[in-house]
């Protein structure tokens, strides 16, 4: 029953936090992240990241990306996939190189410095999606490019991570050799094509004929969670599966019914827990000891994604402000970077001495990113 009380506290606190944030013209997600900092070990210490909080937050981020997929215009995603490729590629090369360079400057072991760069290369677009949704700019060329780039980014980061682990430690994120892992992922994306084209429309049509309460919503959640599970199984982020599940269901005539119901479910319970869980990981006990390292690496984390995304978008003839908006949308690190950090620690590539400071770097860049994204979005869409 203890978790029920914790959940109640989180829901009340995030509602108040969102309200206060919006009153001051700040994205609501900032209020929810700060609630996590306040309630966690860095603040009052009332809530700790336990298994149930983790599971609820995982469902929250999956539902958030499912909603982003439902809201996305497939034709726009196809149209801006090419600029998304440029943005993702440069958004990985810049952080990996400058993350490694920063590690070398602080006299970190070479393998560990390389892993710093890989951690900074991971983008967690779920928080950016929340800002895009709040400002109603998901279905714009910038929003579609950010979403397309995040998909490519996730695939490339997984490949870089797999290769780096194999090269640096002789291990991998999967038990399979890299060529077989790539083949698995290729088949997964082939299955996504089949899902969008035929499977999802058939399943949603079947659900309409089932005499059971909320059969349509249940079927959509089965598709969402099933695709997330399969993505996780082959070494991709579960949010990639959720995003494409949303796109698949968005091609059916029950799209709006599914969106309204899943949005109510997600924002009532699971999504606030996800944003709070990010804030719960903050621990300021190591902050004063390594403040220079934390501040410089945070600056590197922000600038490399912003500039990499900017140059990638400029290659595709975006205006300067639009390109900066795309770059800003790629800054957030979130859960993907934390997962890579954990893998690095378990593989003895990240020393405990640097673990907490790196968590703080990831969380600081995640906290700052919505403000930067909102600023550049307002410059592009002033009205």
Swiss-Prot record:
One of its GO terms (biological process) is proton transmembrane transport. It is a multi-pass membrane protein. One of its GO terms (molecular function) is sodium ion transmembrane transporter activity. The keyword Nuclease does not apply. Signal peptide: none annotated. The chain crosses the membrane at residues 1-21, 24-44, 51-71, 83-103, 112-132, 145-165, 186-206, 216-236, 262-282, 291-311, 323-343, 353-373. Keywords: Antiport, Cell membrane, Ion transport, Membrane, Sodium, Sodium transport, Transmembrane, Transmembrane helix, Transport. Pfam families: Na_H_Exchanger. Gene3D superfamilies: 1.20.1530.20. NCBIfam families: 2a37 (TIGR00932). This is Na(+)/H(+) antiporter. It comes from Enterococcus hirae. The lineage of its organism: Bacteria, Bacillati, Bacillota, Bacilli, Lactobacillales.
């Amino acid at each position: 029953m203890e978790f029920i009380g914790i959940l109640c506290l989180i829901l009340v606190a995030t509602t108040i936090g969102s309200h206060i944030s919006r009153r001051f013209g700040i994205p609501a997600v900032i209020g929810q992240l700060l609630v996590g900092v306040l309630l966690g070990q860095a603040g009052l210490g009332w809530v700790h990241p336990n298994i149930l909080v983790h599971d609820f937050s995982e469902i929250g981020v999956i539902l958030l990306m499912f909603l982003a997929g439902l809201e996305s215009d497939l034709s726009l995603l196809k149209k801006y996939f090419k600029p998304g490729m440029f943005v993702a590629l440069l958004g990985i090369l810049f952080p990996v190189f400058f993350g490694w360079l920063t590690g070398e400057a602080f006299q970190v072991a070479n393998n560990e410095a390389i892993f710093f760069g890989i951690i900074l290369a991971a983008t967690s677009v779920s928080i950016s999606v929340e800002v895009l949704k709040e400002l109603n700019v998901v279905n714009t060329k910038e929003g579609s490019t950010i979403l397309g780039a995040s998909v490519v980014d996730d695939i490339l980061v997984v490949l870089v991570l797999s290769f780096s682990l194999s090269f640096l430690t002789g291990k991998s994120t999967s038990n399979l050799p890299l060529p077989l892992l790539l083949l698995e992922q290729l088949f997964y994306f082939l299955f996504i094509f089949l899902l969008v084209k035929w499977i999802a429309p058939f399943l949603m049509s079947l659900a309409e004929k089932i005499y059971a309460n909320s059969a349509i919503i249940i079927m959509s959640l089965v598709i969402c969670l099933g695709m997330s599970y399969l993505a996780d199984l082959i070494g991709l982020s579960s949010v990639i599966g959720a995003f494409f599940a949303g796109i698949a269901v968005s091609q059916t005539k029950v799209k709006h019914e599914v969106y309204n119901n899943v949005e109510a479910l997600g924002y009532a319970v699971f999504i606030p827990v996800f944003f709070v869980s990010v804030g719960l990981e903050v621990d300021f006990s190591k902050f004063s000891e390594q403040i220079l390292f934390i501040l410089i690496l945070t600056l590197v984390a922000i600038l490399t994604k912003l500039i990499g995304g900017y140059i990638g978008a400029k290659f595709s003839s975006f205006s300067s402000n639009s390109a900066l908006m795309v770059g800003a949308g790629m800054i957030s690190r979130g859960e993907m970077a934390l997962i890579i950090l954990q893998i690095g620690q378990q593989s003895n590539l990240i020393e405990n001495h640097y673990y907490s400071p790196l968590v703080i770097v990831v969380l600081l860049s995640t906290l700052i990113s919505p403000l930067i994204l909102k600023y550049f979005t307002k410059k592009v869409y002033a009205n």
